[in-house]
Swiss-Prot record:
Gene3D superfamilies: 5' to 3' exonuclease, C-terminal subdomain (1.10.150.20), DNA-directed RNA polymerase, insert domain (2.170.120.12), RNA polymerase, RBP11-like subunit (3.30.1360.10). Homodimer. The RNAP catalytic core consists of 2 alpha, 1 beta, 1 beta' and 1 omega subunit. When a sigma factor is associated with the core the holoenzyme is formed, which can initiate transcription. SUPFAM superfamilies: C-terminal domain of RNA polymerase alpha subunit (SSF47789), Insert subdomain of RNA polymerase alpha subunit (SSF56553), RBP11-like subunits of RNA polymerase (SSF55257). It comes from Thiobacillus denitrificans (strain ATCC 25259 / T1). The gene is rpoA. This is DNA-directed RNA polymerase subunit alpha. Keywords: DNA-directed RNA polymerase, Nucleotidyltransferase, Transcription, Transferase.
């Protein structure tokens, strides 16, 4: 028998899969009101915080701006860019990649025509990009990046020095969740009939399975709320101030990143000895480094991404006191 002050926890979790991309996740019982409290929080996280992959920059041969038309191609550039946004990409161990499409002659250009490596998947290869007429030709380079939520092109700062000539910035919708809704129904436990059943109806693009998306959203919510469970009072004035804590990963030498000898030597020549030094540099700054080109830069970015880091990060209190440089 449950006491009057004890909170119910969901004991039943059911997954009803309509397809590999569409499922309903049903959880019960919840105390009255908790279905809406948790359902709304999970829905917002699912829509805004799932990691996905999207085109962010496109360069089309012979095209200067997005309002152009291409001879021999039925769609104009705006339509081609919209079609590219509908492709579901999945990358393994990479934060960004440059993909190419090259096709000529009458026919349909689909996502399956994109040249990808072993570490990149196109999950909907039949998705149509454009239609070519007789004598038509389409050559493109597509930059794919990892991200979360929606990011308009105007919000991304891309240096003109590193941006390819004729490339077009694209509004990026990274979220792998196409649609999510929740409903709260009545549930019953023994004599109690005022409880909630939470039903989350979710559809993804295949980059992440519906159930895994819900699990990830729940972990994010728990992580964000856990800080409130450890609230402490304001330290007394007599206590000595604590020195800022620095992530031990940032104190490791760049040699630990296992970069090529060329890349590592270029960094050290710029007095970049620690990972904390490196992540504060921007792409533009690194490209100004003698003998460090785009290939080395991409290598550095991929290695940092595998550790949850990126270039251009801001660190307070760096370097920490007592840090000895070679």
């Amino acid at each position: 028998m449950q006491s009057a002050t004890e909170f119910l926890k969901p004991r039943i979790v059911e997954v009803d899969r309509a397809s590999p991309l569409h499922a309903k996740v049903i959880m019960e019982p919840f105390e009255r009101g908790y279905g809406h409290t948790l359902g709304n929080a999970l829905r917002r996280i699912l829509l805004s915080s799932m990691v996905g992959y999207a085109p962010t920059e496109v360069a089309i041969s012979g095209v200067v701006h997005e309002y152009s038309t291409i001879e021999g191609v039925q769609e104009d550039v705006v339509d081609i860019l919209l079609n590219l946004k509908g492709i579901a990409f999945k990358m393994h161990g990479k934060a960004e990649a440059i993909l190419k499409v090259s096709k000529s002659g009458e026919g349909v250009v689909t996502a399956g025509d994109i040249e990808v490596g072993h570490d990149i998947e196109v999950l909907n290869p039949d998705h149509v990009i454009a239609h070519l007429t007789k004598g038509g030709k389409l050559d493109m380079e597509i930059k794919i990046e990892a991200g979360r939520g929606y990011q308009p092109a105007t919000a991304r700062k891309v240096s003109e020095e590193t941006r390819a000539v004729g490339s077009i910035l694209v509004d990026a919708s990274f979220s792998p969740v196409r649609r999510v809704a929740y409903a709260v129904e009545s549930a019953r436990v023994e004599q109690r009939t005022d409880l909630d059943r939470l039903v989350i109806d979710i559809e993804t693009n295949g980059v992440v399975e519906p159930e895994e998306a819900v699990r990830t959203a729940a972990r994010i919510l728990v992580s964000q709320l856990s800080v409130f469970a450890d609230l402490e009072g304001t330290p007394a004035e007599s206590e000595s101030p604590r020195s800022p804590q620095v992530d031990p990963l940032l104190l490791r030498p760049v040699d630990d990143l296992e970069l090529t000898v060329r890349s590592a030597n270029c960094l050290k020549a710029e007095n970049i000895y620690f990972i904390g030094d490196l992540i504060q540099r921007s792409e533009t700054e690194l490209l100004r480094t003698p003998n460090l080109g785009r290939k080395s830069l991409n290598e550095i970015k991929d290695v940092l991404a595998s550790k949850g880091l990126s270039l251009g990060m801001k660190l307070e209190n760096w370097p920490p006191a007592g840090l000895e440089r070679p």
